[in-house]
A protein has these predicted regions:
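Hydrophobic helical h-region of N-terminal Sec-dependent signal peptides
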Residues: 9-13
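C-terminal segment of classical bacterial N-terminal signal peptides
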Residues: 14-20
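Extracytoplasmic copper-binding redox domains, predominantly the cupredoxin/blue-copper superfamily
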Residues: 20-233
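Bacterial N-terminal signal peptides that target proteins for export
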Residues: 1-8
Length: 233
């Protein structure tokens, strides 16, 4: 069965819903279309000394088989549940935020590190949560914060270095994942039931809600998606 949304394609292939192991949803996100080349980012002289590598935008990170990284995948209608384990860590390293995409549960504390010998500032610009803007000295103490409202995605920037961005998915349960460099994802510990699963890619979907598909978990399930590059205006 195939569902088409504006600029998006969901591929729900026959047999893509499979029982595997208890409590997991696994899948793969692939990109349809050829993205434009990433743009090179000119660094300041001080950042160029810290990071001598070529730095580019990260709009579409795709492997040789079309696997799409940095997709935030989550259950839209899962019941609220507390976080399991420690919250994520966002690092400023080589004058870049790492990782580019990360996720957190509402109320869960996350940390921001500065591993650079360079002043940065951490400036999330949420629409539903409380904004903050804090300087962080070179190799200084971690910043620890949390967000109280579900929001996909919260932009985090550095006003000192305008090319530095990261994006955080905030949901009220731990049933989410970010695709790896091959486009694979795994959501663990999911209770049995029917869900709407969402795959959201920042560049492809923008203000759109992402690609959605319904699935039923009985022990575990598999769900693949295809994300289509939007047509040029």
């Amino acid at each position: 069965m195939k569902y088409c949304l504006p600029c998006l394609t969901v591929a729900a292939l026959a047999g893509s819903l499979q029982l595997v192991a208890a409590g997991e949803i696994t899948g793969k996100i692939t990109l349809k279309g050829t993205p434009k080349p990433e743009l090179e980012i000119p660094l300041t002289p001080s950042c160029g000394k810290i990071n001598p590598n070529k730095v580019t935008t990260r709009h579409y990170v795709v492997d040789k088989d079309g696997g799409l990284a940095n997709v935030f995948v989550y259950l839209k209608d899962a019941k609220a549940a507390p976080a399991t384990g420690e919250g994520p860590v966002l690092d400023q390293k080589g004058c870049m935020y790492e990782p580019y995409i990360l996720g957190v549960v509402t109320g869960q504390k996350f940390k921001v590190k500065n591993s650079d010998p360079e002043l940065h500032n951490v400036h999330p610009t949420p629409k539903l949560n409380k904004e903050f803007n804090l300087g962080q000295i070179p190799n200084g103490p971690d910043i620890t914060r949390s967000f109280d409202q579900a929001e996909v995605l919260v932009r985090i920037k550095c006003d000192v270095h305008p090319w530095m961005f990261a994006y955080m998915g905030v949901v009220d349960h731990p049933y989410f994942a970010i695709t790896d460099k091959e486009g694979n994802f795994k959501i663990a510990g999911v209770p049995d039931g029917k869900y709407t699963i969402v795959a959201y890619h920042l560049k492809a979907h923008g203000a759109n809600p992402g690609v959605t598909q319904t699935l039923e978990v009985k022990g575990s399930a598999k769900q693949d998606f295809t994300v289509e590059i939007p047509a040029a205006p």
